[in-house]
């Protein structure tokens, strides 16, 4: 005798078949889980905390060093750019003077460390060295400086300084000085980048970092370097506008 199978029973059997095929015990599905685990492992490696912490320290140090270069350059720009009255006063104070005084702790010191500098009106600056032996060196340093000043010895212990009227030639000369400062700073930044490149290469050689890690590190380093160069160029452009 044949058993009559209803459509409902056939549908239920079909559902059970498909359910068994898609069950976690199926080799295909287990393979999918293994693939997912492997993928998750790769993702975890991409965010390896050991690499991230190590490189972040290097990058922060790199950025901090570049920041110091920028700050020093900004200060040099500020001192070099000819400004009215107070600017001239600040420029003179920032001059380095070879000192022959036996009391001098170093062979070269700032003018403000070896003399009293005061401003008398907008067109006259008076310098009184603490020791008369430094007068000759101060006069020579002012004469050799890039600043448009005329210095005269009033007496044995006093120097008078008057700003010269700036000319196109003197402004162009000062612009070259500013560009020289920027070039020096750019070279310092490049040297810092080279040092960081060596550190990255060292980690790659020792296999402390993977090739992907090193690629990411170099990319971030290059981005930080480009930003630093752009900031430098912007500072130079701003300083040149005040000169020419």
UniProtKB/Swiss-Prot annotation:
GO BP, one annotated term: translation
A Gene Ontology term for the protein's cellular component: mitochondrion
Localization annotation: Mitochondrion
Keyword Oxidoreductase: no
Keywords, ordered alphabetically: Mitochondrion, Protein biosynthesis, Transit peptide
Entry keyword Amino-acid biosynthesis: no
GO terms of molecular function: ribosomal large subunit binding; translation termination factor activity
SUPFAM superfamilies registered for this protein in UniProt: Ribosome recycling factor, RRF
Protein's UniProt name: Putative ribosomal recycling factor, mitochondrial
Protein encoded by which gene: rrf1
């Amino acid at each position: 005798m044949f058993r009559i199978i209803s459509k409902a029973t056939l549908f239920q059997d079909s559902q059970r078949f498909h359910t068994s095929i898609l069950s976690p015990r199926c080799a295909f599905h287990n393979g999918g889980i293994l693939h997912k685990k492997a993928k998750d492992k790769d993702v975890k490696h991409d965010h390896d905390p050991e690499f991230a912490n190590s490189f972040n320290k290097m990058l922060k140090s790199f950025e901090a060093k570049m920041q110091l270069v920028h700050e020093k350059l900004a200060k040099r720009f500020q001192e070099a750019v000819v400004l009215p009255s107070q600017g001239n006063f600040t420029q003179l104070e920032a001059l380095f003077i070879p000192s022959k005084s036996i009391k001098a702790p170093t062979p070269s010191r700032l003018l403000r460390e070896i003399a009293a500098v005061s401003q008398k009106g907008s067109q006259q600056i008076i310098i009184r060295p603490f020791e008369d032996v430094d007068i000759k060196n101060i006069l020579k340093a002012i004469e050799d400086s890039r600043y448009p000043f005329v210095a005269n010895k009033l007496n044995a212990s006093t120097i008078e300084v008057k700003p010269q009227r700036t000319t196109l030639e003197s402004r162009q000369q000062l612009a070259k000085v500013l560009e020289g400062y920027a070039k020096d700073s750019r070279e310092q930044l490049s040297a810092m980048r080279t040092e960081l490149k060596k550190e990255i290469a060292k980690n790659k050689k020792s296999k402390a970092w993977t090739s992907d890690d090193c690629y990411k590190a170099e990319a971030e380093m290059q981005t930080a370097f480009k930003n630093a160069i752009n900031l430098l160029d912007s500072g130079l452009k701003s300083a040149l506008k005040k000169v020419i």
